[in-house]
From Swiss-Prot:
This is Neurotoxin BmK-M10. GO terms for molecular function: potassium channel inhibitor activity; sodium channel inhibitor activity; toxin activity. Residues 84 form a propeptide. It comes from Olivierus martensii (Manchurian scorpion). Residues 21-83 form the LCN-type CS-alpha/beta domain. It is found in: Secreted. Keywords: Disulfide bond, Ion channel impairing toxin, Neurotoxin, Secreted, Signal, Toxin, Voltage-gated sodium channel impairing toxin. Belongs to the long (4 C-C) scorpion toxin superfamily. Sodium channel inhibitor family. Alpha subfamily. Disulfide bonds join 31-82, 35-55, 41-65, 45-67.
Amino acid sequence: MNYLVMISFALLLMKGVESVRDAYIAKPENCVYECGITQDCNKLCTENGAESGYCQWGGKYGNACWCIKLPDSVPIRVPGKCQR
């Protein structure tokens, strides 16, 4: 029984776990992608591995793309200034 648990744990570690999060997708300089229509955001988000996306109007960063289930490997807007 212990062998089964250890093998399962080892397989989990070898495979790795890809987590996802809902967030504003960001440009390399920590700026959001501004938007006007949801279709543009949905395309941007899904091209970057998210499940979907939409244009969030009047949010914390103005009209910006919000992605749902965005992979950890894609940059998101973090607190701090946009470095344009």
